[in-house]
């Protein structure tokens, strides 16, 4: 069965708490993850919360990568949604793991827009 896109939902636990609260670091991680998976970056937007936490999104020509962090509990929720044949969202995972350093993580892999051939 063919599909239009691939959507990875990531649960990242016991992450580096300083990384989770580092807005510039999150922006760099989003850029690195985008480049690693072969996507085309349109823009990155982030917001730093007070007293802690960062939300960010990399808008891609092929869709998006998003992150929401909770430094107080060492947790991050991420989505990597890509469309197209030349982009592989799994290739973004090492850049994410290198920056956030999760002790454990889960990934849910969803095929979007499945079509019967």
UniProtKB/Swiss-Prot annotation:
Its EC number is 4.1.1.50. It comes from the Archaea. Pathway: Amine and polyamine biosynthesis; S-adenosylmethioninamine biosynthesis; S-adenosylmethioninamine from S-adenosyl-L-methionine: step 1/1. The active site is at residues 63, 68, 83. Binds 1 pyruvoyl group covalently per subunit. GO terms for molecular function: adenosylmethionine decarboxylase activity. GO terms for cellular component: cytosol. GO terms for biological process: spermidine biosynthetic process. Keywords: Autocatalytic cleavage, Decarboxylase, Lyase, Polyamine biosynthesis, Pyruvate, S-adenosyl-L-methionine, Schiff base, Spermidine biosynthesis, Zymogen. It catalyses: S-adenosyl-L-methionine + H(+) = S-adenosyl 3-(methylsulfanyl)propylamine + CO2. InterPro entries: AdoMetDC_C (IPR042286), AdoMetDC_fam_prok (IPR003826), AdoMetDC_N (IPR042284), S-AdoMet_deCO2ase_core (IPR016067), S-AdoMet_deCOase_pro-enz (IPR017716). The modification Pyruvic acid (Ser) is found at residue 63. The record marks 62-63 as: Cleavage (non-hydrolytic). Its cofactor is pyruvate. Is synthesized initially as an inactive proenzyme. Formation of the active enzyme involves a self-maturation process in which the active site pyruvoyl group is generated from an internal serine residue via an autocatalytic post-translational modification. Two non-identical subunits are generated from the proenzyme in this reaction, and the pyruvate is formed at the N-terminus of the alpha chain, which is derived from the carboxyl end of the proenzyme. Catalyzes the decarboxylation of S-adenosylmethionine to S-adenosylmethioninamine (dcAdoMet), the propylamine donor required for the synthesis of the polyamines spermine and spermidine from the diamine putrescine. NCBIfam families: SAM_DCase_Bsu (TIGR03330). Belongs to the prokaryotic AdoMetDC family. Type 1 subfamily. Heterotetramer of two alpha and two beta chains arranged as a dimer of alpha/beta heterodimers. PANTHER family: S-ADENOSYLMETHIONINE DECARBOXYLASE PROENZYME. This is S-adenosylmethionine decarboxylase proenzyme. It comes from Methanococcus aeolicus (strain ATCC BAA-1280 / DSM 17508 / OCM 812 / Nankai-3).
């Amino acid at each position: 069965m063919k599909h239009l896109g691939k959507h990875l939902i990531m649960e990242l636990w016991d992450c580096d708490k300083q990384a989770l609260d580092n807005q510039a670091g999150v922006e760099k991680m989003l850029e690195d993850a985008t480049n690693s998976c072969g996507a085309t970056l349109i823009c990155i937007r982030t917001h730093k919360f007070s007293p802690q936490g960062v939300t960010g999104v990399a808008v891609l020509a092929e869709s998006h990568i998003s992150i929401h962090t909770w430094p107080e509990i060492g947790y991050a929720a991420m989505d990597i949604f890509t469309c197209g044949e030349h982009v592989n969202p799994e290739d973004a995972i090492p850049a994410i793991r290198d920056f956030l350093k999760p002790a454990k993580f889960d990934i849910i892999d969803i095929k979007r827009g499945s079509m019967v051939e």
